[in-house]
């Protein structure tokens, strides 16, 4: 339709030019005739009388009419005859005048002048010109208000220059679109500096694409991959001179670039003055313009992305984000941001506003700061992304997302939602209250208590924007749904998908499971889907055959392949850990039951040649040991599931003990770390449970047991309960009110329930020891230790109620003893001390049920 309009406009223009030239020739002929060729009849009025619309009384002798003589004007009849329609038999080819031929000649000269530029690589305008936008409405919709000069531009993660060989993909549909680009006078002339935007874009600090409408690309598989017709505006050509300079310091493409000051200022003006109404529906392609700054793109809560209308301007101005090399604070205060639509998560910088204490605002950290914050405060607690920062930023994240094919558009989609999940992870992993006093660090530094607390005014604003847990869960669910939407595409292009993209895609699932574990939520559905996705990639085969796999050779390609397989196995290891954590929390059977206790060192401290810095899980050796402690704690959870009583056949006859005490296969980490403290607390709880379950086999359980046997049993139980209480208190003190470990929420609740169930044991043991006739010095020491144990339990009660982000666990009013009714074989008590021992046995069965059927 645009092509037909352009053709008709050109034809009318040619006809008007031809008519004007014909009239000029007629006037020249009339002037040349002079006074010798005057009109001979008064069939028409003169020009002056026709203009004044009066009667023309022409007199032959005076050669003038009465009106002209009266006004002393020249009586002339020089009107050009009106052009009439074509005569019969008229054809367009025969009727083409000199004007049309001259127009074609002018066009030929213009094409000839551009012949030299066709042989060189062509730099097309930014992709956001491909979508016709009129006042925030799609092309064809009536405009309700004057449109902005052009839709605001988003910075692409990667730019690939367009060369002539890409024109081989043109089809008949594309040819029609290219012919409908509008008249030549309305097309924009781009400066030469815009041709280098591809090289400028490669060095950008942004590692993540910003396709707010990327999801619908994969909802319309039949859509054409060719760009729609160009819609350009000549009034905005000067603002597209140069993209921002590189900002990420780790990339191998981060080379210093020198740009003109005027182009840089125009780029800033472009990002900060976009106040027109622009609506980007979700069914738009990521190849279209990224209309917002790259630091803020999380579109998680809504199906469309809408910026404020032209009339909704705010007083605050959007500040430009500065580079990390500059001393100024790169964080933009919320007070300097424009309004944000309610109900949206992670709207762009120009569309943000404070939404109360329940809003989730993504994009407060740039891409570089986001990765830095993850490796500084999250990665040391558990390697969700199982690779060091240098390899991630310099290799894995360097993915081509230019929409030249469906595979590249898929890369763009995956990388975008990976960034969204990573920033939501920092929302979950950061505490925004009571952190300045807990940390002795400077208020201008980023620390574990406030990842975004760079300035005092920002912290003050941040207190009003603490996201509610329900909104965090809604954002996680939406991110998870977007991953499921793309999964069929990934399966279809699995052979042609880069291992980098596969690593990013699988890491996003691990991030979501990590966040749900941090929040203490039931993630059965998410975990089951994640296991299904991992199994479709056949990663379990790599893990099962790890010990018999071939060693990588000297070839770099072979080492690269084994390196990415190592990353896949690390990710599957983490998935098995979260599966075991889910099973321990809710008592559900494990979805994947592969043993991993023996794989801690081979996977995370591999032998050569995979022990190089490139494939190391952490490049800093000092931080590697705490990280391995968290990994060993995850392996302990899997072993707790494997050694369950209900996992095997339970005895139907009386037995001395349901489970023989034995040490764990996992090597215990150091005691001075938070994972190590949790590890030893769980081991102490298991030892106490085994000791209580073994009471029926002890000689003191007999009705006529001697006092010495009773005191000996009390000493064994006292040592077990004191050690368990001491480990739990040490764990909670080390973890603090905000445990950074993903297992902290679940393990703290498990230990809290265990303390509640066993809190009467010290008092009963003290009474039993005092009631016996035999008193020794060790008895007095045991009483002192049990008294200290009672004091520790009081402190534990207070510490467990200060845990965040999970709510403090409520004590269970009644824990049923179903297992004791099924498998207990002890008879009724026959003596007073047996009454106490039966109470201990009842506590043991309750503890066993808590371990076997779920901590929550």
Swiss-Prot record:
Record protein name field: Glucose transport transcription regulator RGT1
InterPro entries noted in UniProt: Carb_Metab_Trans_Reg, Zn2-C6_fun-type_DNA-bd_sf, Zn2Cys6_DnaBD
GO cellular component, one term: cytoplasm
A matching Pfam family: Zn_clus
CDD domains: GAL4
Residue ranges, annotated region (Disordered): 1-42, 83-121, 168-244, 261-330
Sequence similarity: Belongs to the EDS1/RGT1 family.
Comp. bias regions, Polar residues: 168-183, 303-312
DNA-binding region residue numbers: 46-75
Biased segments, Basic and acidic residues type: 18-37, 99-117
Coiled-coil residues: none
């Amino acid at each position: 339709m645009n092509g037909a309009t352009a053709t008709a406009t050109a034809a009318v223009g040619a006809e008007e030019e031809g008519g004007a030239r014909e009239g000029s020739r007629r006037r020249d002929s009339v002037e040349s005739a002079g006074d010798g060729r005057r009109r001979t009849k008064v069939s028409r009025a003169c020009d002056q009388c026709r203009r004044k619309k009066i009667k023309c009384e022409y007199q032959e002798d005076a050669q003038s009419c009465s009106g002209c003589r009266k006004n002393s004007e020249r009586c002339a009849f020089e009107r050009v005859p009106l052009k009439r329609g074509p005569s019969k038999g008229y054809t367009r080819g025969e009727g083409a005048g000199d004007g049309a031929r001259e127009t074609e000649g002018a066009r030929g000269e213009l094409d000839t002048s551009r012949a030299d530029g066709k042989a060189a690589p062509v730099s097309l305008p930014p992709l956001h010109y491909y979508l016709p936008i009129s006042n925030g409405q799609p092309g064809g919709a009536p405009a309700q208000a004057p449109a902005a000069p052009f839709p605001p531009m988003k910075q692409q993660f990667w730019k690939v220059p367009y060369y002539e060989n890409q024109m081989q993909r043109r089809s008949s549909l594309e040819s029609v679109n290219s012919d409908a680009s509008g008249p030549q006078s309305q097309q924009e002339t781009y400066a030469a500096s815009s041709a280098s935007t591809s090289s400028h874009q490669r060095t950008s600090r942004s590692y993540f694409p910003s396709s707010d409408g990327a999801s619908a690309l994969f909802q319309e598989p039949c859509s054409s991959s060719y760009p729609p017709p160009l819609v350009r505006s000549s009034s905005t050509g000067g603002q597209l001179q140069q993209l921002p300079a590189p900002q990420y310091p780790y990339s191998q493409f981060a080379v210093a670039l020198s740009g003109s000051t005027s182009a840089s200022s125009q780029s800033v003006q472009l990002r900060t003055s976009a106040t027109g109404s622009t609506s980007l529906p979700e069914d738009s392609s990521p190849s279209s313009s990224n209309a917002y700054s790259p630091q803020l793109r999380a579109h998680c809560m809504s199906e469309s992305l809408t910026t404020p209308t032209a009339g909704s301007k705010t007083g605050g101005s959007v500040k430009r984000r500065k580079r990390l090399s500059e001393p100024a604070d790169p964080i933009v205060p919320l007070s300097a941001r424009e309004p944000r639509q309610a109900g949206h998560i992670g709207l762009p910088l120009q569309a943000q506003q404070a939404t109360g204490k329940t809003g989730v605002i993504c994009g407060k950290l740039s891409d570089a700061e986001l990765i830095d914050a993850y490796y500084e405060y999250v990665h040391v607690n558990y390697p969700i992304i199982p690779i060091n920062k240098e390899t991630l930023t310099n290799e894995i994240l360097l993915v081509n997302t230019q929409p030249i094919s469906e595979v590249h558009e898929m890369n763009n989609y995956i990388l975008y939602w990976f960034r969204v999940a990573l920033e939501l992870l920092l929302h979950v992993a950061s505490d925004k209250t009571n952190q300045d006093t807990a940390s002795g660090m400077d208020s201008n530094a980023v620390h574990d208590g406030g990842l975004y607390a760079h300035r005092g005014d920002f912290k003050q604003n941040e207190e009003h924007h603490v996201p509610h847990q329900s909104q965090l869960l809604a954002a996680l669910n939406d991110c998870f749904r977007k991953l499921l939407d793309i999964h069929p595409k990934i399966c279809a292009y699995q052979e042609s998908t880069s291992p980098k993209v596969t690593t990013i895609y699988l890491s996003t699932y691990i991030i979501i499971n990590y966040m749900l574990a941090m929040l203490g939520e039931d993630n059965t559905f998410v975990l089951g889907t994640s296991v299904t996705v991992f199994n479709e990639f056949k990663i379990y085969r790599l893990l099962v055959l790890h010990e018999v796999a071939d060693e990588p050779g000297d070839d770099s390609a072979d080492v690269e392949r084994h390196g990415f397989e190592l990353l896949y196995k690390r990710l599957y290891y983490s998935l098995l850990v979260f599966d075991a954590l889910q099973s321990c929390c809710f008592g559900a059977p494990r979805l994947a039951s592969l043993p991993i206790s023996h794989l801690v060192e081979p996977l995370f401290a591999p032998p050569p040649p995979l022990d190089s810095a490139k494939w190391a899980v952490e490049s800093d050796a000092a931080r590697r040991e705490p990280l391995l402690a968290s990994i060993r704690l995850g392996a302990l959870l899997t072993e707790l599931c494997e050694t369950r009583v209900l996992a095997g056949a339970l005895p139907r006859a009386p037995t001395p003990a349901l489970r023989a005490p034995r040490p764990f296969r996992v090597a215990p980490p150091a005691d001075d770390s938070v994972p190590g403290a949790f590890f030893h607390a769980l081991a102490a709880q298991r030892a106490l449970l085994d000791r209580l379950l073994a009471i029926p086999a002890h000689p003191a359980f007999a009705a006529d047991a001697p006092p010495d046997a009773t005191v000996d049993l009390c000493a064994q139980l006292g040592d077990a309960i004191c050690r368990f209480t001491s480990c739990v208190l040490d764990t909670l003190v080390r973890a603090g009110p905000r445990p950074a470990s993903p297992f902290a929420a679940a393990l703290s609740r498990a230990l809290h329930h265990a303390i509640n169930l066993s809190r009467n044991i010290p008092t009963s043991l003290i009474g039993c020891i005092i009631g016996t006739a035999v008193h020794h010095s060790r008895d007095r020491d045991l009483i002192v230790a049990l008294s200290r144990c009672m004091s520790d339990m009081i402190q534990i009660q207070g510490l467990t109620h200060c845990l965040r982000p999970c709510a403090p666990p409520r004590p269970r009013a009644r824990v049923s003893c179903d297992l004791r009714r099924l498998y207990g074989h002890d008879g009724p008590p026959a003596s007073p001390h047996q009454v106490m021992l039966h109470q201990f046995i009842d506590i043991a069965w309750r503890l066993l049920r808590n371990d076997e059927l779920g901590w929550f």
